């Protein structure tokens, strides 16, 4: 079972919040106190809250649920992509486009365009175009890949979103709320926990902390997917 210990979190610097002057009072229940002008997060709260979130992630994955990892901050971007690919899930790591969830119909059309361009680039269509037209299409494809590459095979809305940095990704959280999609989020001391179903109070800037969250989340998802596979095999054997 995916679990994270107090020691893991201390070593990764999960407890270091933001400077006290930037705090959000809604995070008061999760703050241990100030130290040298920085708020220290109470890991006695974070550890059980995160482990509870991991149990739920495993459950969602075991029901063949789609999990969308969201992290567009520079410190999170590449790690979010790697984590999602590692557990065969989906990601947005460049920029959240408004309506990515709430206007899925339009997003689906853009994904279709991206896949059409990918096919054209591989089947020789680009070679028949003028250099200028081929360049225009290549640039369009690269731009779409940057924005939608992580969700092009999602096939529909996700069953949950896992967010690194609630303040930075507030639009994604709001869209998920509007659609009733459960939100798991790392919430730092300068952020609001509003709209987050599974609040994980913690540092959302330190790369070691981000790696810890994502490593545990991917393990939880993989465990859930393995349960799903085992269940399918049991049913197949019974038939």
From Swiss-Prot:
CDD domains: RPS2 (cd01425). It comes from the Bacteria. One of its GO terms (molecular function) is structural constituent of ribosome. Keywords: Ribonucleoprotein, Ribosomal protein. InterPro entries: Ribosomal_uS2, Ribosomal_uS2_bac/mit/plastid, Ribosomal_uS2_CS, Ribosomal_uS2_flav_dom_sf. The keyword Ribosomal protein applies. PROSITE patterns: RIBOSOMAL_S2_1, RIBOSOMAL_S2_2. The keyword Ribonucleoprotein applies. One of its GO terms (cellular component) is cytosolic small ribosomal subunit. One of its GO terms (biological process) is translation. Belongs to the universal ribosomal protein uS2 family. NCBIfam families: rpsB_bact (TIGR01011). This is Small ribosomal subunit protein uS2. It comes from Histophilus somni (strain 2336). The gene is rpsB.
């Amino acid at each position: 079972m995916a679990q994270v210990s107090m020691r893991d979190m201390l070593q990764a610097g999960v407890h270091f919040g933001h400077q006290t002057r930037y705090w959000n009072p809604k995070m008061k229940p999760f703050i241990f106190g100030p130290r040298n002008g920085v708020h220290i997060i109470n890991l006695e709260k974070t550890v059980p809250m995160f482990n509870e979130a991991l149990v739920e992630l495993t459950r969602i994955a075991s029901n063949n649920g789609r999990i969308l990892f969201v992290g567009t901050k520079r410190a999170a971007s590449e790690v979010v992509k790697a984590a999602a690919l590692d557990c065969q899930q989906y990601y947005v790591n460049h920029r959240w486009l408004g309506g990515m969830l709430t206007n899925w119909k339009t997003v689906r059309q853009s994904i279709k365009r991206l896949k059409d361009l990918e096919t054209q680039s591989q089947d020789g269509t680009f070679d028949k175009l003028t250099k200028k037209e081929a360049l225009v299409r290549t640039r369009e494809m690269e731009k779409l890949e940057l924005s939608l590459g992580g969700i092009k095979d999602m096939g529909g809305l996700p069953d949950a979103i896992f967010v690194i940095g609630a303040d930075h990704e507030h639009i994604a959280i709001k869209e998920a709320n509007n659609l009733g999609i459960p939100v798991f989020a790392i919430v730092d001391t300068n952020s609001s926990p509003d709209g987050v179903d599974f609040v994980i109070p913690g540092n959302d800037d330190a790369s070691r902390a981000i790696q810890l969250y994502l490593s545990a989340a991917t393990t939880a998802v993989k465990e859930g997917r393995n349960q799903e596979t085992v269940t399918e095999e049991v049913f197949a054997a019974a038939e």
